[in-house]
């Protein structure tokens, strides 16, 4: 088997592409114009900082970053310590409490410990303007994150993709189901969680698949405070 690439290889290759240069230039220009862009520049690529390429076991796919102050820090669904847990994550915690024995709902929404265990918390779009959801969609980020998913699809085996809602499911349509495991459910948003996200048991299912492959499971439990 060929040696696995690193994120440095994958992202480095994309950095040479004109679309990606344009994306980064657009974001930089927006910041330079005085607009509040989230997450801060140092956090935009945190999903890759905390989960190395060859450590990826599970991928959770989000849409775009939270657009309120101090929320987004580069990991989908996660917020910084001290920030109120957003509604979709509240529902993820409710499902975890039903799905994972002994799971206690923490007083925060900081999911970095998942990332450090091999859960790639990837948004489709990696930046957003304050108060304007989807404001940075169609600026090139989607192409970049497609390439990220394609790299995992091509070079890894047995990764569990948790695709919640039609956006994530459409994004993941080219994943090779013979090599990887794709678990779908409605989005945990309050608008759709009751349509089948609750009761879908994605977290225990992911761990069962990892056990079958002889991989270490994800400890979904979170510290009560951070």
UniProtKB/Swiss-Prot annotation:
Catalytic activity, EC: 3.2.2.27
- What is this protein's name? Uracil-DNA glycosylase
Q: What is the lineage of its organism?
A: Bacteria, Pseudomonadati, Pseudomonadota, Gammaproteobacteria, Vibrionales
Catalytic reaction equation(s): Hydrolyzes single-stranded DNA or mismatched double-stranded DNA and polynucleotides, releasing free uracil
Outline what the protein does: Excises uracil residues from the DNA which can arise as a result of misincorporation of dUMP residues by DNA polymerase or due to deamination of cytosine.
Localization per record: Cytoplasm
Keyword presence, Cytoplasm: yes
Q: Which SUPFAM superfamilies match?
A: Uracil-DNA glycosylase-like
Gene from which the chain derives: ung
A GO-annotated cellular component = cytoplasm
Active site annotation, chain numbering: 64
